[in-house]
Amino acid sequence: MIIATAGHVDHGKTTLLEALTGINADRLPEEKKRGMTIDLGYAYWPQPDGRVIGFIDVPGHEKFLANMLAGVGGIDHALLMVACDDGVMAQTREHLAILQLTGQPTLTVALTKADRVDDARLTQVKAQVMATLNDYGWHDATLFVTAATEGVGVEALRDHLRQLPERTHPAGQRFRLAVDRAFTVKGAGLVVTGTALSGEVNVGDTLYLTGANTPMRVRGLHAQNQPTERAFAGQRIALNISGDAQKADIRRGDWLLSDAPPQAAERVIVTLDRHAPLQQWQPLHIHHAASHVTGRVSLLEDNLAELVFDTPLFLADNDRLVLRDISARQTLAGARVVTLETPRRGKRQPEFLAFLNELASARTDADALRLHASRGAVALATFGWARQLSAASLDALAGSGDYLQANGYLLSSALAARWQEKLLATLARYHETHSEEPGPGRERLRRMALPSEPEPLVLALIERMRRDGQLASREGWLHLPGHKAGFSEAQQALWEKIQGLFGDEPWWVRDLAREAGEEEQAMRQLLRLAAQQGFITAIVKDRYYRHDRIVAFADLIRTLDREKGATVAADFRDSLNVGRKLAIQILEYFDRIGFTRRRGNEHLLRDSALFNSAL
């Protein structure tokens, strides 16, 4: 349980906290001297049942509001202090606005300094406070009258705080901690502290430290000021860490993460909760957890907007941010992350805005995955980071729906059906325009039909279609099941007459027609039909090899690729003992069909599934 204090400067937050816990949370000499909290202070209150309630004492002065914002991320409850003599003040409202915009935690009110006012003033302040709370959405907050220096109301407040229910945190999430302090301890080394927003951490784990961009090993843990082997979301945690980083490398706003993050977000799409009007492309101060950057807002529609950061932030879906004016005097709005994936164009298209509104309303990770998958292939690593899902949770989620998965990508059944239509239509057109070929290889079909889609998914879909009988294949060549070539009776007789002429060397159509004493056009038609049936293969127009020779050439290329990393014309020519021109024709044929690809003078193996008798 983590409770944050809130309230106007000099309303007795630190004094009451000391009365509750016995600890003065002001930790800086300047704070002691001024009598006000400047930075975040912490106090821990052990309970008889073994629990430890942690308090974050935030500054009340407007000048130090950025520090206050760093303290309210990840809290379970807020304790609002209002001095009876002053009543509700500017920073009281400011703190309530910030608490509302960062998730509206449950709230308790302590009226402080009650010994300084009479009953009439106390009644007046109670009414003022309850009306103010109602304005900000707290309709049933419990209120206590206290005078910390006299001990009035302190025990009743203690009893109430002890009975507060702990906030539950989702299971199966990655560990994520926002760093708010870093220091060194003699004999232990580097220590960082912060509030864990999700997941759990164990002694011995390796975490990724942003800012320093390096992995760090967890040597020791304190949770809620108690030594432990394991700590969880919702706790104040101190981590003794070691690795390639020093105290000087760490800043407030850095993160300790269970997984190395993707690139930090330069822009995100959010929903807004406005307390004041926002203008298009208005400059802002933007607060997230312990981070504070500047940026601008691009308004999209209703409460949807895009935030563009001057300094990138490590964000996840549903993270909350607070937007303040560029002079840092007014809290303007809260924002909740809808998606980290922001297209450069088309953000205001009705279809995309409808998707964003649905996504903003998604209640579960399964709902979010379904919506993303309705628009295109989903990269599971990207989705897993955005939702902060552990590997096990992500696997379970991806396996719970009707999805096609391959190599870290996921495709919905509806989109898979659409892709299948494209593949079949492309293959039908290929048969029409390349009647002399049995069909393309899977890589070539992918590049023709779905060139911009994730390769593993397309190839997995092609394989599924092959297994289901929607596609047929021979030696890796794909064709429609109905695409079958055959000889007429006269052509069959002619083929039987000439097939014995095909030895190890290729034939030109005109030469073979002359040799057999047949018309050239009739011979050309016959050889095209023979090629469709896989008996022969054209390396260039009208020049044919017996098909088993092409298979032998493919095996040679595999050998050269394995031994030398690539095939060059000279090696290929020498191995076959043929002329350079013929060697180049053969290699260019393999490039053309996608078995190899050319890089300078080299030919690299591309689709090894071709010329495979098992396929």
Model-derived segments and their meaning:
Residues 58-63, 72-96, 100-124:
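Conserved Switch II/interswitch segment of TRAFAC-class P-loop GTPases
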Residues 114, 131-276:
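Conserved catalytic-core segments of large NTP-driven translation/proteostasis enzymes
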Residues 3-7, 11-20, 63-69, 87-90, ...:
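P-loop/Walker A NTP-binding module and the surrounding RecA-like catalytic core of P-loop NTPases
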Residues 1-58, 205:
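Conserved G1/Walker A P-loop phosphate-binding module
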Residues 83-84, 108-123, 143-152, 297, ...:
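G-domain G4 guanine-recognition motif of GTPases
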Residues 10, 16, 35, 57, ...:
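Residue-level signature of catalytic and energy-coupling elements of molecular machines
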Residues 61-62, 85-89, 104, 113-118, ...:
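Conserved nucleotide-binding/hydrolysis micro-motifs of P-loop NTPases
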Residues 5, 106, 117-121, 128-131, ...:
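C-terminal effector modules of nucleic-acid-centric enzymes and ribosome-associated factors
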